């Protein structure tokens, strides 16, 4: 097994390359997911993913769909690199006895990977959600302001339009959170992130490994790239839908700004209880298909880059058979 020890720098580079490509491709869908998950009953501005994206383009322009992308593009490299490299590391450590990994050990490796990645994922998601949801809140205020003007047209005193709230930047948000809440401000929703990412990794990595194994040639060579891509897509979408209820709760908890008449939450259980009481069980599946559409190609691309060993080629290292 010693000759198969993984090259950590190569895995980190592969994970980073995959993350950058994937985020660039699917970020608008992720924005739609965040806005759909954050809108509550009685305050619905969007009826579907396509409706959200169309309204976003109309009100904020094409690049409005990429609000918060800079945060993801900056932090997705360490985030994806940690996730993939940690899973590889734990799988290697758990297979040192020369035995084939059991399903339990594969799930254990995935659990370790999911736990490691939240170091980067939590602040990344915290900042991204504020930037993504700012457009929804601004549009809601604009609609309410227009309604107030219409209702006040018959009054003697003319209504004054409220000044537009400046939209925050990632730097401003980070500075404000650190000043007001310290480092803990960037890690709000850490528990919910763990409850989402650990089960996701427990489902994703073993499912991917077994699906990828089905496409491995009888000669023992690595699976073709299209098999790795499809295995990543299927495993990613299945895991994403499975943990979507936790993702809805996490999104609500990490949203610092609320719309008119929207609930506030004191913690994970309080948030889950209020969603169930006020919006019903179906609310936990808000944005599920968006999340599946985001995760499927994101992890499909990641696994293709990872299994092609682009970094190994760049660094002149031998490819380790997965």
UniProtKB/Swiss-Prot annotation:
It comes from the Eukaryota. Solcar repeats lie at residues 6-93, 101-214, 223-312. The keyword Membrane applies. It catalyses: L-glutamate(in) + H(+)(in) = L-glutamate(out) + H(+)(out). One of its GO terms (biological process) is L-glutamate transmembrane transport. The chain crosses the membrane at residues 12-32, 62-82, 107-127, 189-209, 223-243, 292-312. It is found in: Mitochondrion inner membrane. It is a multi-pass membrane protein. InterPro entries: Mit_carrier, Mito_Solute_Carrier, Mitochondrial_sb/sol_carrier, Mt_carrier_dom_sf. One of its GO terms (molecular function) is L-glutamate transmembrane transporter activity. It holds the Pfam family Mito_carr. Its main location: mitochondrion. Keywords: Membrane, Mitochondrion, Mitochondrion inner membrane, Repeat, Symport, Transmembrane, Transmembrane helix, Transport. GO terms for cellular component: mitochondrial inner membrane. Mitochondrial glutamate/H(+) symporter. Responsible for the transport of glutamate from the cytosol into the mitochondrial matrix with the concomitant import of a proton. Plays a role in the control of glucose-stimulated insulin secretion. Belongs to the mitochondrial carrier (TC 2.A.29) family. This is Mitochondrial glutamate carrier 1. It comes from Bos taurus. The gene is SLC25A22.
């Amino acid at each position: 097994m010693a000759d198969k020890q993984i090259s950590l720098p190569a895995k980190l580079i592969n994970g980073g390359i995959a993350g950058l490509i994937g985020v660039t491709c699917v970020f608008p869908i992720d924005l739609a997911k965040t806005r759909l998950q954050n809108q509550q009953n009685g305050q619905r501005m969007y009826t579907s993913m396509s409706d959200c994206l169309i309204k976003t383009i109309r009100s904020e322009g094409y690049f409005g769909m990429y609000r918060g992308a800079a945060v993801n593009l900056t932090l997705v490299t360490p985030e994806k690199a940690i996730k993939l490299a940690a899973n590889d590391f734990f799988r290697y450590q758990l297979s040192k006895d020369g035995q084939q990994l059991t399903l339990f050990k594969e799930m254990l490796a995935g659990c370790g990977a999911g736990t490691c990645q939240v170091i980067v994922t939590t602040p990344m998601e915290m900042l991204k959600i504020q930037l993504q949801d700012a457009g929804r809140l601004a549009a809601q205020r604009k609609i309410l302001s227009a309604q107030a003007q219409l209702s006040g047209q018959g009054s003697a005193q003319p209504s004054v339009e409220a000044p537009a709230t400046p939209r925050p930047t990632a730097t401003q948000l980070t500075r404000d959170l650190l000043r007001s809440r310290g480092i803990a401000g960037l890690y709000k929703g850490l528990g919910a992130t763990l409850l989402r990412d650990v089960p996701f990794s427990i489902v994703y990595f073993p499912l991917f490994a077994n699906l990828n194994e089905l496409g491995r040639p009888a000669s023992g060579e690595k699976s073709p790239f299209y098999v790795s891509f499809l295995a990543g897509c299927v495993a990613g979408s299945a895991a994403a839908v499975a943990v979507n209820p936790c993702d809805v709760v996490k999104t609500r908890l990490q949203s610092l700004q609320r719309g008119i008449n929207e609930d506030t939450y004191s913690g994970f259980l309080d948030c889950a209880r209020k969603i169930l009481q006020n919006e019903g069980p179906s609310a936990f599946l808000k944005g599920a298909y968006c999340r599946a559409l985001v995760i499927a190609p994101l992890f499909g691309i990641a696994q293709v880059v990872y299994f092609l060993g682009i970094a190994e080629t760049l660094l002149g290292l031998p490819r380790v058979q997965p």
